[in-house]
């Protein structure tokens, strides 16, 4: 059923009040970020029921008003392939990300991009320079493709739902993406991909790998504040992985530098040598002598032995914060150190998400924006009128009562940053 008039949509909603459904948005341009895009159409199928294609901007149909999207909240649960994408189009309640459900069970993404029609392939190949191609692809071809796509959602929508990942983490990543980053004279948008083998999100869009902007060349230089009275502020966690592991193992690092503390156990070494040695032991093999003489790595070794034993015995382990299940069946060529590295990256990710859940409400009434999160750092586009109290508030939330100290830096662009830790 093609739905192109508001009263048709009203009738569809009334017939299916509170019923669960599948939703597949069709954006006008397949190559542009959802935040730089417009809505072409939305496919809806009631679970075990009827279907409809809602037309918002297509050359063959009349147009529904975009405000009518909010009436979809009168339906029940809404199963989608990409909740984060939908968040950028419209915020609806009771949305379940089926790709996330599948990933939590299989540790990989749904096979989705492979689904197409000959017509879609032709238009995308021949008219690759044209914008908003989906508006001219025959509407019935969109219907045909959506009918194939919904079969994938129907196959997996009954898998278990991890509510904290589905709601908290996806919404946090949506929030950061919505801020964008000023690059040269425009705003560019990042796209976080949560569905990686380790659980640590990647972040790339439009040929830019935002998670790996090089500090040494000038890759970061085009990025600057969008505000006339603004600067970039970055907070970096100090010795983050060591402190994360220390926290879950109840190892109390003294105030000051972790690497200076660890030097006490390594003999006559420099600060940099101490740092490199600690990371070598953390991510590789811990020598028996270190296990016997270093209380931190003694606990780390015991923890690695425990989770490896649990992994072999139970065929899974759970992450430390959000209790994500890591299944043995989904990981090949696993060993004890590799498993520990997975757990560290997952611990890092989940702790960052936990912090973001506290940070985002603090940012809601501020003009400054959180624009990038990269493993152990958070980058803000800071409007000076938000004041020093804003930066101190951010620092307090990030450091979680002093458990995870940060260093801070500022710059007119992301390449030329100067340390301001002592000023905060």
PLM segments and residue spans:
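Helical catalytic core of nucleic-acid polymerases
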Residues: 87-157, 161-179, 214-336
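Acidic, glycine-rich two-metal-ion catalytic cores of nucleic acid-processing enzymes
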Residues: 2-3, 11-18, 24-52, 56-60, ...
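C-terminal polymerase-core module
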Residues: 181-182, 285-292, 299-343, 381, ...
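Generic structural signal for residues in well-ordered beta-strands
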Residues: 92-95, 370, 406-408
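Short amphipathic alpha-helical segments
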Residues: 1-2, 11, 46, 133, ...
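Conserved DEDDh/DEDDy metal-dependent 3′-5′ exonuclease domain
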Residues: 2-10, 16-152
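A glycine-rich phosphate-binding loop feature that marks nucleotide/adenosyl-phosphate handling sites
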Residues: 99, 165-169, 185, 193, ...
């Amino acid at each position: 059923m093609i739905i192109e008039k508001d009263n048709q949509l009203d009738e569809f909603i009334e017939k299916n009040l509170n019923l669960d459904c599948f939703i597949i948005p069709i954006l006008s341009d397949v190559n542009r970020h959802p935040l730089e895009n417009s809505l072409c159409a939305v496919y809806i199928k009631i679970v075990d029921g009827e279907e409809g294609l809602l037309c918002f901007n297509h050359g063959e149909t009349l147009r529904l008003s975009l405000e009518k999207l909010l009436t979809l909240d009168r339906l029940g649960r809404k199963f989608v392939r990409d909740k984060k994408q939908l968040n950028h189009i419209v915020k609806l309640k009771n949305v379940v990300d089926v790709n996330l459900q599948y990933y939590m069970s299989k540790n990989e993404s749904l096979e989705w991009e492979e689904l197409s029609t000959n017509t879609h392939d032709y238009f995308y190949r021949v008219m690759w320079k044209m914008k908003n191609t989906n508006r001219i692809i025959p509407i019935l071809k969109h219907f045909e493709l959506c009918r194939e796509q919904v079969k994938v959602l129907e196959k997996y929508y009954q898998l278990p739902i991890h509510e904290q990942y589905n709601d908290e983490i996806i919404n946090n990543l949506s929030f950061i993406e919505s801020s964008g980053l000023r690059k040269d004279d425009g705003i560019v948008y990042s796209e976080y991909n949560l569905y990686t083998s380790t659980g640590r999100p990647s972040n790339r869009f439009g040929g830019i790998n935002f998670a790996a902007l090089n500090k040494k060349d000038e890759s970061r230089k085009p990025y600057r504040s969008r505000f006339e009275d603004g600067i970039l502020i970055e907070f970096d966690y100090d010795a983050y992985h060591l402190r994360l592991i220390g926290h879950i193992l109840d190892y109390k690092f003294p105030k000051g530098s972790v690497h200076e503390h660890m030097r006490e156990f390594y003999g006559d070494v420099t600060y940099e040598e101490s740092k490199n040695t600690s990371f070598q032991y953390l991510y590789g093999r811990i020598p028996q002598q270190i296990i016997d003489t270093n209380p931190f790595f003694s606990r780390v070794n015991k923890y690695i032995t425990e989770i490896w034993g649990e992994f072999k015995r139970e065929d899974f382990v759970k992450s430390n914060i959000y209790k994500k299940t890591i299944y043995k069946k989904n990981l090949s060529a696993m060993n004890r150190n590799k498993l520990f590295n997975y757990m560290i990256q997952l611990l890092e990710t989940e702790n960052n998400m936990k912090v973001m859940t506290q940070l985002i409400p603090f940012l809601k009434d501020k003009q400054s924006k959180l624009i990038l999160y990269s493993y152990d750092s958070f980058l803000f586009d800071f409007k000076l009128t938000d004041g020093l109290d804003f930066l101190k508030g951010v620092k307090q939330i990030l450091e979680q009562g002093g458990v995870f100290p940060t260093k801070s830096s500022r710059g007119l662009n992301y390449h030329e940053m100067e340390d301001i830790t002592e000023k905060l």
